[in-house]
């Protein structure tokens, strides 16, 4: 098959949507090399991570000479897909071009409907644009991929997408999270980032929906002799300032460690050295940091809402994300129970096999083949 991909997020996004795009294309190249992969992007972002990604793959990149690059991605790409004899075009992050050619089969991945569930966090104009793009893509796609049963449920309830048109295909995480860092690597990483000996870990964007402030408030309520430092890997703007103001006002600077910029290759060791991974998000399409933690052998505390129980499995610890008291109790009780933590991480490592790279990639290839 000649498979085309919307690769803008692959080259320019280094969190959830970009990771999904890179992992799928990388896995297709590794496990199904007989297929020809075509990456369509208005331009390429020249960074260490994109260079490493491109040098490791067999692929073709297609760009436009049109100065209106966003116009090409939304309206002008169709004729290029026909020219390149693309069999399947996959919109990896919610979008398919308008004027899509009938000669080409189409798949779109919908990660979440966050802007519909939390409209107060988005500008009115942005919501209208997103809704137009999402509904158009769901309408014209030959198949809609939802990354969780929770997202499938939202698509049916909010956009009335026919259930039979939706396929739930989970995502995997990068292979490096399954590789155990040796003691020397862990210690070098600890020194490099000035990490405490024992710590709690949060990885993700620092935005309101991710709920970092409630973690900090819960830690603040724990008696000082039981408090464990929190390492935060991620960046943010206004909400991050709000969190940092709370930390400053309550004298918690020595307990909360922010790592805004890290080398991606160091992230597995940071997960592996953590006592617990904490992710009490209010809503996720899937929650890839949860399976990164499980693959790394780190026990997880996460929310009992949206897709997070799908990602965390039966042996992660679940809390009401709005209950600071529940989170406080978990952060007090779990670190003190080493036997339970050991059971959690062993069962978590077994559960995360559900998201095996080859398995989920095979499911996607089978979906592509079913459309031809």
Map each language-model feature to its residues.
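Carbohydrate transferase catalytic cores enriched for Leloir-type hexosyltransferases
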Residues: 1-372
């Amino acid at each position: 098959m000649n498979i085309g991909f919307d690769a803008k997020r692959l080259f320019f996004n280094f969190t959830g949507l970009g990771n999904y795009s890179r992992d799928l294309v990388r896995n297709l190249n590794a496990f199904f090399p007989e297929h020809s992969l075509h990456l369509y992007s208005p331009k390429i972002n020249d960074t260490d991570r994109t260079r490493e990604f491109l040098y490791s793959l067999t692929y073709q990149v297609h760009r436009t000479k049109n100065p209106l690059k966003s116009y090409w991605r939304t309206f002008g790409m169709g004729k290029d897909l026909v020219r390149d004899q693309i069999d399947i075009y996959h919109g990896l992050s919610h979008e398919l071009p308008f004027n899509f050619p009938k000669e080409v089969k189409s798949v779109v991945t919908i990660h979440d409907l966050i802007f519909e569930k939390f409209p107060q966090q988005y500008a009115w104009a942005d919501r209208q644009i997103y809704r137009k793009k999402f509904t158009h893509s769901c309408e014209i796609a030959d198949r809609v991929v939802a990354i969780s049963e929770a997202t499938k449920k939202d698509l049916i309830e909010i956009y009335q997408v026919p259930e039979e048109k939706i396929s739930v295909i989970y995502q995997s995480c990068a292979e490096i999270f399954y590789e155990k860092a040796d003691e020397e690597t862990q210690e070098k990483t600890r020194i490099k980032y000035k990490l405490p000996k024992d710590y709690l870990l949060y990885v993700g964007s620092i935005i309101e929906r991710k709920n970092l402030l409630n973690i900090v408030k819960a830690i603040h309520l724990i008696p000082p002799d039981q408090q464990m430092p929190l390492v935060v890997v991620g960046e943010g703007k206004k909400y991050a300032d709000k969190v940092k103001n709370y930390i400053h006002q309550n004298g918690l600077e020595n307990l909360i460690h922010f790592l805004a910029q890290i080398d991606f290759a160091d992230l597995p060791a940071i997960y592996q050295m953590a006592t617990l991974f904490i992710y009490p998000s209010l809503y996720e399409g899937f929650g890839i940091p949860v399976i990164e933690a499980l693959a790394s052998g780190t026990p997880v505390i996460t929310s009992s809402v949206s897709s997070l129980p799908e990602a965390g499995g039966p042996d992660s610890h679940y809390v009401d994300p709005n209950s600071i008291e529940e989170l406080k109790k978990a952060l007090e009780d779990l670190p003190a129970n080493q036997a339970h933590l050991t059971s959690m991480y062993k069962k978590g490592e077994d559960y995360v096999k559900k998201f095996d790279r080859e398995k989920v990639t095979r499911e996607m290839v089978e979906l592509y083949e079913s459309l031809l």
